[in-house]
């Protein structure tokens, strides 16, 4: 960080035993923002060819299946460091995004869902706004980290 003039966003891998170790190290190193989670490492086998389906044997798993893991890791990191977090991993609805905010993400990012629903981000924003109105939140920041 001491050589960077721009904000430093550290994207953390979920392929660790304890995400808080990485979060603390990134915070101590001067990260301005944490981004988590990246993809989980997975493997697919082509049962007809009886070999690996991916050229590198393993690859990144993303999408709805990783969401509960991402929520847990955002929660753990948010409770370990005082660094803003961009929560990502399997977000495909307003409910998914709200979960991330409630456990401590200051912002969210949508990835895989954009491939099959080009309006997903707009739908999520609309859903968050409706949730805020229904639950009397004046701003998104009022929601951040209230689930302890």
What kind of region is each of these model predictions?
Residues 142-148:
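A short, charged, Gly/Pro-tolerant segment at domain boundaries
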Residues 91-95, 117, 148:
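Small/polar glycine-rich anion-binding or flexible loop at a beta-alpha turn
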Residues 21, 25, 76, 113, ...:
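Alpha-helical scaffold segments in soluble metabolic enzymes
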Residues 70, 96-97, 118, 134, ...:
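Residue-level recognition of conserved structural "scaffold" positions that shape functional pockets
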Residues 1-86, 92-110:
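Alpha/beta enzyme core
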